[in-house]
């Protein structure tokens, strides 16, 4: 009897199959068990039982030869392993584990709609045991509801590091359910072990379904099967075909709309539909762009050079004022082509200075130039302004002179040493070359760079 109990403890540590009947009888007749109360005798190891859930579904698969898909990343089982336990002590803690053992030592193949042996089985990989995530838990927790191993996955990757069950393809296996009494998975010793297995759960591991009947059963009972997704795609294709059947009438309506005048108007470019706005001279609005001499010549609000519409508005800036005061730079520019005049302003990138449009020589012959009096340079304005609100304002002269005389005042004599040259004249137009008494570079070092304090 002692030898049997020692073998029983060894089997509990290594998760061996069921306890033998002789050992179980010895446990019942032991003197230690006689002192156990009648209430505790209800929770003896031999009183623990288990039943398979979804047994009818498992029976349908077992009749055709159950197949389970295994992949490199791991695949869940269907039908799922689901059992129900009873006879456990409600306050004692138990652990629930599952492992898979081969049914025989053969490798199988699918031939002529049946499985047949095809040789010796491959060496079994290291046995792995899947521990239920709720372990350890009191017996009342395990007996409360059916226990499902939903997250259990099967793989054929021998180097798997995710804890999946490693199996060989074309081999037959069966799952075993172990009930272990233990308060802790690692520290406390394991108690008595009860092992359960069900013949309906036997299956053949495959990488692809071999039996078409098994495939149909999977599609009909597994809501996550691939066949359901293919069926949804077929429904979508049917919807597309229905829309294609209605498309001729829609195309006919589209054709009628294209023949209507509204479609012709919508096909015109945006530049041709832009409302032409009246043009006015910049002298009436931006007086700082035109000198006093030109403002007094009585320029008309409508520029004769611009017959087309132009949506571009020129905003005065510091650089634009300098540009209009420099006749040499302005004379080097050209007029823009007439196609640029009708282009929307949102698509044109205007520079900081006031630009003068360019044009080809043929278009220059059409434009008329207003000659200015007492001036040898052509200062015609090639920019059109579209601001109707400012047309009624009278033409005015410049609001300020370019420079004041105070900026060119000669510094006090006490600040710098006496020099042999005169200060700059107030009239900027009469400035000329100034003769300096110093001819060498070394003589310039005793004076400041600028003889005037303008900033």
From Swiss-Prot:
GO terms for molecular function: DNA-binding transcription factor activity; RNA polymerase II cis-regulatory region sequence-specific DNA binding. Residues 229-276, 295-360 are annotated as: Disordered. GO terms for biological process: positive regulation of DNA-templated transcription. Residues 308-326 have a biased composition (Polar residues). CDD domains: T-box_VegT-like. PROSITE patterns: TBOX_1, TBOX_2, TBOX_3. Gene3D superfamilies: Transcription factor, T-box. Vegetally localized in oocytes and expressed in the presumptive endoderm and mesoderm at early gastrula stage. Expression is down-regulated in the endoderm by the end of gastrulation but maintained in the lateral and ventral mesoderm of the blastopore lip. One of its GO terms (cellular component) is nucleus. The keyword NAD does not apply. Keywords: Activator, Developmental protein, DNA-binding, Nucleus, Transcription, Transcription regulation. SMART domains: TBOX. It holds the Pfam family T-box. It comes from the Eukaryota. InterPro entries: p53-like_TF_DNA-bd_sf (IPR008967), T-box_DNA-bd (IPR046360), T-box_sf (IPR036960), TF_T-box (IPR001699), TF_T-box_CS (IPR018186). The keyword Lipid biosynthesis does not apply. Residues 229-241 have a biased composition (Basic and acidic residues). It is found in: Nucleus. Residues 57-230 bind DNA. Its main location: nucleus. Forms a repression complex on the promoters of the nodal/nr1 and siamois genes with the maternal factors tcf7l1/tcf3 and pouf5.1/oct-25. Interacts (via C-terminus) with tcf7l1/tcf3 (via N-terminus). Also interacts with the other POU-domain transcription factors pou5f1.2/oct-91 and pou5f1.3/oct-60. Transcription factor required for both mesoderm and endoderm formation in the embryo; signaling determinants and concentration levels may determine which germ layer is formed. Acts together with beta-catenin to activate genes that are responsible for mesoderm induction including wnt-8, eomes t/bra, siamois, mix1 and sox17. Directly binds to promoter DNA. Patterns the mesoderm along the dorsoventral and posterior axis. Activates siamois gene transcription when alone or in combination with beta-catenin, but inhibits siamois transcription in combination with pou5f1.1/oct-25. This is T-box protein VegT. It comes from Xenopus tropicalis. The gene is vegt.
């Amino acid at each position: 009897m002692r030898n049997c109990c020692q073998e029983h403890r060894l089997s509990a540590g290594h998760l061996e199959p069921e306890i033998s009947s002789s050992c179980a009888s010895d446990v019942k007749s032991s003197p230690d068990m006689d002192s156990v109360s009648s209430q505790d005798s209800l929770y003896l190891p031999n009183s623990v039982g288990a039943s398979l859930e979804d047994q009818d579904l498992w029976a349908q698969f077992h009749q055709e030869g159950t197949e389970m898909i295994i992949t490199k990343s791991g695949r869940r089982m269907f039908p799922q392993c689901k059992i129900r336990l009873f006879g456990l002590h409600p306050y004692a803690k138990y652990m629930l584990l599952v492992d898979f053992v081969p049914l025989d030592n053969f490798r199988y193949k699918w031939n002529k709609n049946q499985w047949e042996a095809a040789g010796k089985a491959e060496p079994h990989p290291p046995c792995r045991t899947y521990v239920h995530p709720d372990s350890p838990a009191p017996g009342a927790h395990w007996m409360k509801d059916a226990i499902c191993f939903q997250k259990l996955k099967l793989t054929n990757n021998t180097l798997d590091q995710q804890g999946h069950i490693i199996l060989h393809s074309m081999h037959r296996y069966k799952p075993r359910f172990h009930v272990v009494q233990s308060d802790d998975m690692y520290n406390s010793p394991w108690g008595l072990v009860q092992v359960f297995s069900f013949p309906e759960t036997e299956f053949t591991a495959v990488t692809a379904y071999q039996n078409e009947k098994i495939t149909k059963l999977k599609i009909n009972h597994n809501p996550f099967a691939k066949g359901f997704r293919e069926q949804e795609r077929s429904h979508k294709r049917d919807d597309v075909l229905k829309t294609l059947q209605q498309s001729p009438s829609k195309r006919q309506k589209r054709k009628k709309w294209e023949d209507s005048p509204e479609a012709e108007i919508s096909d015109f470019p945006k530049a041709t539909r832009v409302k032409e706005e009246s043009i006015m001279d910049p002298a009436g609005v931006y007086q700082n762009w035109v000198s006093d001499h030109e403002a007094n010549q009585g320029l008309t609000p409508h520029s004769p050079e611009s017959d087309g519409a132009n949506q571009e508005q020129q905003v005065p800036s510091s650089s634009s004022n300098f540009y209009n005061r420099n006749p040499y730079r302005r004379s080097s520019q050209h007029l823009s082509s007439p196609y640029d005049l009708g282009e929307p302003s949102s698509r044109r990138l205007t520079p900081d200075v006031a630009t003068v449009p360019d044009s080809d020589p043929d278009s220059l012959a059409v434009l008329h130039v207003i000659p200015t009096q007492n001036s040898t340079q052509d200062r015609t304005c090639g920019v059109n302004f579209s601001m109707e609100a400012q047309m009624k304002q009278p033409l005015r002269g410049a609001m300020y002179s370019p420079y004041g005389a105070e900026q060119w005042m000669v510094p006090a004599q006490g600040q710098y040493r006496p020099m042999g040259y005169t200060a700059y004249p107030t009239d900027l137009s009469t400035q000329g070359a100034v003769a300096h008494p110093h001819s060498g570079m070394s003589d310039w070092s005793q004076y400041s760079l600028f003889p005037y304090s303008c900033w």
